[in-house]
Structure formats: structure tokens, C-alpha cells
Amino acid sequence: MISFGNVSALQAAMPQARNEILNEGKLSIGGKEYTINAATQEFTRANPTSGAVARFFEATGKLFREGSTQSVAKAITKAVFDNEQGQAQRLQTSSSVEHGQMLFKDANLKTPSDVLNAFAKLDSKMVKSHAAELSQLAERAMTEVMLETDSGKNLKALIGDDAVKSLAVRVVKDYGGGVAAAQKNPEVRINQMQAVFDMEVMHLKAAQRHIEGLASTDLNQGVYAEGLPEDAFNKAGVTNNVERAAAWIINASNSKGNDAENITSLLKEYATNGKDLLNMDNLKELHARLVPNVERDYRGPNISGGTLPSSIGGEGMLKQHIEGFLKENPVADKDLGKHLFAGVIGYHGFTDGNGRMGRMLYAIAELRNDSFNPLAMNAENSLHGIK
């Protein structure tokens, strides 16, 4: 067994002796054995002397020599676990409960809500010395709580497990309030974030009803068939369908610096390369080439009166739409472009360039059918349904 005469000797041996102590699972200080409780990252006195009288004299002698058994155990715990290596181990745990049990030294924490409630007991010294880790733990626990709410479960049913987890992390970071909120009243923040999730569900379901409803609609008549006059977008009077499509995409975009050469090149390539347009990875690849250097990687849920969902929720719905709904409910080749246009813009699954991407896919589908019919604004609005 690894042995030290006193706590000071242990402290002097750190951090070199740390791994050996962890592998051993125990150590001796002043002739007394202490074992590791892995669940709480702490040491406890092992095999105390039997008999009440003997334990009394042991404790009394220990107290006079170097403090109580409990204080020695705390000092060992601090030396071995209150460092970067101990923090790294805590951050690698699989849940906020495991993390919280280790950081707060409390095996009675059984749920993420228990972890959040434990923040109320923190003193200012602990908050200051472990600020970054406490912030991560608070966000982690709030995220796990959110996923178990009815709002979280409803959102998961729409966009899937991975997407709802990603969105929960972002929402908690934006609205959770961190350590201060966890200390004060985490339930208030949880309720507020549930309202954000509920708005997201409402927007996604509204988009889903509209977009999937197009599958039972004749898109070759009425407003859906309205075309844009040639002179409204084709100022140069080009006659090649690829060039006409490029002119239409550029004319409709509000973004500055559209690369006409790049758009034309992509149209030529995808018109003949046969890549599956009902594959999300293929769409992401095309989007990255069409809209390079996107400045942001996330658009949050709309809570200020608009109807757009978050980019994460929108992407999740778009993936399910093209890889699930449209494959299970196939549409005519001549209508595929309109359905892709509606899905990309209606769900708004990219952080930027949704309009360009929707028009690009519409144009590619048209070109694969050896035609190009430019959509009028009324047709576009009726297809994507965004108010």
C-alpha cells in the first residue's frame, strides 16, 4: 500500500503520485488506511479500530496530532482530486448526476433536478474557485432536465434525439442563466425555456402541415404554376436554360456578392451528375459550395413574433422530409423541384442561404427534366408558406 507519514508528505508527492494512488484505490496516512469512493471523488477512513473505546482514543490521538479523521480525509481528497486532472475526470462523466456527485461530494444526488437544487447550498468561495466548471455543470443539468420535460419530448418526437439534444444545449446557453440562476430558482428558468421549446414545436408543426400538404396538391395549376416574366430576371436575354436559371437565382437573392460563375458551374454540374437530391448529406455538400464562408453556425428559435424555426429544428425537419416523407410519398419528377424548394425554405434548415439553396434545387430538378420554368413570387410564397 502507498504510505505517507502525514498529509504534508502526500501533498509534496503530488501530482506525480496521483495515478499510482488512483490505481491502488487506497493509501495510508500516518498508519491509517483511507479508500477512494469513486462515485464522489473522495477518500474515507477504512477499517477503523474496533470497539467504541478504542475508536475514541484513536480519534482523540489523531485530533491532537493532525486533526480529525474527517479533516484528514478531506485534505487527501483535496490533494488528489481538487486539480486539473480531477476536473477532467468529472467533465468526462456521462451525466450531470455523476458530475454533480463528484463535484459536490454527495452520493444522494440522483436526478438532474437534485443537482440544480444543490447549487443553492454553494458558498461564495466554491463559486469563485470552480466558476467555469460550475457553469458547465449548471448548463448540463438544465439541458438534461429540459429533455425530460413534456416540451422536450414533444420536440424530440418531431426532430429526433440528436437534434433536440443539440438545440437544448443552445437554448440553455442562451436562456438558462448559468450558476446564478441555478442558485436562485432554476425552476423559473426551466419554465421559461419550456416556453421556447413550445414555440419551436408550434412553428415546426405549422411548417410541416403546409409543406407535407403540398403532396396532395396539384402544383401545376393556379398560383403554384405562376411563372416569372422573362424580362423580369433575364436582363441579358440569354437563351440557355442553365444561364437562365442562374439569372433567376441571382435576381431573386437579396444577398450581396453572389458569384454568378459559381452558381452557373454548380447548375451545370448537378444537372447531369445524378446525385440524389433526397439525401441530406448531398444537400449539405451543395449548400457549402453554394454559400461558402457562412458567418454563423446557429439560428435560435423565434420567440419574437416570427414563424421561422431554429436552424437546428429546421434542419432536423428538412432531413426527415427529404429522406423520409418524400421517399415514402414519391412525387412526380416534374414536381420534385417545387417540393424541394418548399422544404428548404419552409423549414429554413440552414443558417444562411436558404433562398438560394431552395432555388438552386428547384432549378437543378427542372434542368434534369430538360426545362426551366422560373417561379413567380406568388408561386414561391405559396410553396414555402412563410408568413
Curated annotation (Swiss-Prot):
Function comment: Adenylyltransferase involved in virulence by mediating the addition of adenosine 5'-monophosphate (AMP) to specific threonine residue of host Rho GTPases RhoA, Rac and Cdc42. The resulting AMPylation prevents the interaction of Rho GTPases with downstream effectors, thereby inhibiting actin assembly in infected cells.
InterPro entries attached to this UniProt entry: Fido (IPR003812), Fido-like_dom_sf (IPR036597), VopS_N (IPR049418)
Domain Fido span(s) in chain numbering: 278-387
Molecular functions (GO terms): AMPylase activity; ATP binding; small GTPase binding
Enzyme class: transferase
Organism: Vibrio parahaemolyticus serotype O3:K6 (strain RIMD 2210633)
Domain notes: The fido domain mediates the adenylyltransferase activity.
Superkingdom of origin organism: Bacteria
Record GO cellular component, one term: extracellular region
Record flagged with keyword Secreted: yes
Name of the gene encoding the protein in the UniProt record: vopS
Protein name in UniProt: Protein adenylyltransferase VopS
Disruption phenotype: Abolishes the ability to inhibit host Rho family GTPases and cause cytoskeletal disruption.
The organism's taxonomic lineage, starting at the top: Bacteria, Pseudomonadati, Pseudomonadota, Gammaproteobacteria, Vibrionales
